[in-house]
Amino acid sequence: MENLKQILADALSAVAASESESALDDVRVHYLGKKGALTALLKQLGNVSAEDRPKFGQMVNEAKDQVQEKITERKASLAKAALDAKLATETIDISLSGKGQEVGGLHPVTRTMERIETFFRGIGFDVASGPEIEDDYHNFEALNIPAHHPARAMQDTFYFNPSTVLRTHTSPVQVRTMETTQPPIRIICPGRVYRCDSDQTHTPMFHQVEGLLIDENISFADLKGILQQFLNVFFEDDLKVRFRPSYFPFTEPSIEVDIMRTNSKGEESWLEVLGCGMVHPKVLEMSGIDSEKYTGFAFGMGVERFAMLRYKVDDLRMFFENDLRFLKQFK
């Protein structure tokens, strides 16, 4: 018993005298380690009488706990002293200017999308949205593209199963609106669309804005006037615009729209920017709209394409690489 008291006193004295964590670790190993002084006492329990053995074992364990507690307290005390000393030698000049946080900016695709939406909202169009995972009916059949129609080959589609796809355009939003809303209808449908394509001018996911206007006595002249005005406002220029015949299953007649662009050498050329046309009567009828009473037009454009033209970006993939050197230019 006396030996235990002496060892405990020596251990506590050694802890109190330690001036560093490494010194405390040495004390811990010397008294509490596998070959430590207090641990050795437990190995001598066999030499203690059976009557005194439980009490002696308890006293040794309590001594070990006491030493460990003092080591922990001493470590905390040393850490606090070190921090106080560090703070005492460091000063902060509160008169110095703070480091301002760099302000982020909108992505160029977002900027372009908002620019398009702002124009069409300004002339009375509402913004409509719909699911990106679509059924075959709304993505194809309701748009006059039945199964095995040659036009399906125009679009490389991501299929979940034979009747469920990632939408290849935002036209299904127009169909769903026509199914639930009676004319007059005046909407644009911005959103992500998906096609199996990837190169300098195509990505598997990109953004479209499609528009739809249905009312009585709507003509191609209305479509032409709105698109001419939109292109002039978007590009901030009085553009030369060309409307030429094309083919889309959901419009008749179908038109592709080109604008005249001038390159760095001063050479002019036509560049396709969007597709449009008068809504096919069959599409109106399939959505429950009387094609004898109502007519309408639809148009669609790729947002990234407009962003590339506006910001003079040559490679579409740069919009999706998250390179801050590129994105910081649009702040």
Curated annotation (Swiss-Prot):
<dbReference type="InterPro" id="IPR002319">
    <property type="entry name" value="Phenylalanyl-tRNA_Synthase"/>
</dbReference>
<keyword id="KW-0547">Nucleotide-binding</keyword>
<keyword id="KW-0030">Aminoacyl-tRNA synthetase</keyword>
<dbReference type="GO" id="GO:0005737">
    <property type="term" value="C:cytoplasm"/>
</dbReference>
<keyword id="KW-0648">Protein biosynthesis</keyword>
<dbReference type="Pfam" id="PF02912">
    <property type="entry name" value="Phe_tRNA-synt_N"/>
</dbReference>
<dbReference type="GO" id="GO:0000049">
    <property type="term" value="F:tRNA binding"/>
</dbReference>
<dbReference type="Pfam" id="PF01409">
    <property type="entry name" value="tRNA-synt_2d"/>
</dbReference>
<dbReference type="GO" id="GO:0006432">
    <property type="term" value="P:phenylalanyl-tRNA aminoacylation"/>
</dbReference>
<comment type="similarity">
    <text>Belongs to the class-II aminoacyl-tRNA synthetase family. Phe-tRNA synthetase alpha subunit type 1 subfamily.</text>
</comment>
<dbReference type="GO" id="GO:0004826">
    <property type="term" value="F:phenylalanine-tRNA ligase activity"/>
</dbReference>
<keyword id="KW-0067">ATP-binding</keyword>
<dbReference type="InterPro" id="IPR010978">
    <property type="entry name" value="tRNA-bd_arm"/>
</dbReference>
<dbReference type="InterPro" id="IPR004529">
    <property type="entry name" value="Phe-tRNA-synth_IIc_asu"/>
</dbReference>
<comment type="subunit">
    <text>Tetramer of two alpha and two beta subunits.</text>
</comment>
<keyword id="KW-0436">Ligase</keyword>
<dbReference type="GO" id="GO:0000287">
    <property type="term" value="F:magnesium ion binding"/>
</dbReference>
<protein>
    <recommendedName>
        <fullName>Phenylalanine--tRNA ligase alpha subunit</fullName>
        <ecNumber>6.1.1.20</ecNumber>
    </recommendedName>
</protein>
<feature type="binding site">
    <location>
        <position position="252"/>
    </location>
    <ligand>
        <name>Mg(2+)</name>
    </ligand>
</feature>
<dbReference type="GO" id="GO:0005524">
    <property type="term" value="F:ATP binding"/>
</dbReference>
<keyword id="KW-0963">Cytoplasm</keyword>
<dbReference type="InterPro" id="IPR006195">
    <property type="entry name" value="aa-tRNA-synth_II"/>
</dbReference>
<keyword id="KW-0460">Magnesium</keyword>
<dbReference type="InterPro" id="IPR022911">
    <property type="entry name" value="Phe_tRNA_ligase_alpha1_bac"/>
</dbReference>
<dbReference type="InterPro" id="IPR004188">
    <property type="entry name" value="Phe-tRNA_ligase_II_N"/>
</dbReference>
<keyword id="KW-0479">Metal-binding</keyword>
<dbReference type="InterPro" id="IPR045864">
    <property type="entry name" value="aa-tRNA-synth_II/BPL/LPL"/>
</dbReference>
